[in-house]
Amino acid sequence: MIKRSRANRTERATFRNIRNEHKFIDVVHHGDGHYYMIQYIKHELPERTVVNYMGTRCGHKQKFRIGKATLMGILEDYKKVEEV
């Protein structure tokens, strides 16, 4: 995890899929023992950027609450994206 909040408890990082360059995961850790993951597809077009969240219900993005072991298994297919 890279970016920490002012309270120094929340960590946030973004990862890109190795095989699909348009697939991303945002991982947030609040220090409560669980990780929260939002998965999305991002397409950069000349006129706009399109973001489609996966696992949505009624068009709202959904956070998945997972443990560290599960997260490490998922992140084997992902590479960390450096934030600007």
What are these regions (language model features)?
Residues K3-N8, Q62-V84:
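Mixed-charge, Lys/Arg-enriched low-complexity segments
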Residues E21-G73:
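Acidic, low-complexity, intrinsically disordered interaction modules
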Residues I2-E21:
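Mixed-charge, Lys/Arg-rich low-complexity intrinsically disordered regions
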